[in-house]
Amino acid sequence: MGKSNSLPSAGRYNANYGNFQSELYAQIRHEAFGEDIGQNSWLTSDEQDRFLQWLDLSPGKTLLDVACGAGGPALRIAAITGCSVIGIDVHEQAVRTASSLAAQRGLAERAEFRATDASGPLPFSDASFDAITCIDAINHFPDRPRVMAEWARLLKPS
């Protein structure tokens, strides 16, 4: 048996999100992905741009980013499209980092981040969002049909 990591899994995520803004992490993202859009996944800017065409976001529209992590992709969407973003993540350190990045990038008025467990009912009214994204995290939800039904409740018609 190998030696177990002394940090519980949430602690490992918190450590990652706590270091997210460091120059080293930015360099790693740039070397791994060829660019740094603040991603915690293999999503590239080209892929995100294709999704943005489908989502048709613009000023006055609102995006919910589920499992937003440190907020990099959501903040890029807000900057490019002019839409408002609400990002939710179960990890409080991720939310703190995302909020800090929003302030640094001058997006705090249009980008809000909350520590919320997205596996249960979400604290938003019906038809609150024009689009919902969840980048590389749907696999973390054991009851995906229930999660999708909740997202359907939150989406505006059309």
Predicted regions and their residues:
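A short acidic, Gly/Pro-enriched loop at the edge of an enzyme's catalytic core
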Residues: G120-I132
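A short glycine-rich, Lys/Arg-flanked "PGG" loop and its adjoining helix->strand segment in the class I
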Residues: P145-P157
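Conserved alpha-helix/loop element of class I SAM-dependent methyltransferases that forms part
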Residues: S41-P59
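A short SAM/SAH-binding and catalytic strip from SAM-dependent methyltransferases
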Residues: A131-D143
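Class I SAM-dependent methyltransferase Rossmann-like catalytic core
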Residues: E31-S41
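N-terminal, positively charged/glycine-rich alpha-helical extensions of SAM-dependent methyltransferases
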Residues: M1-E31
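Class I SAM-dependent methyltransferase SAM/SAH-binding core
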Residues: T62-V66, A70-G120
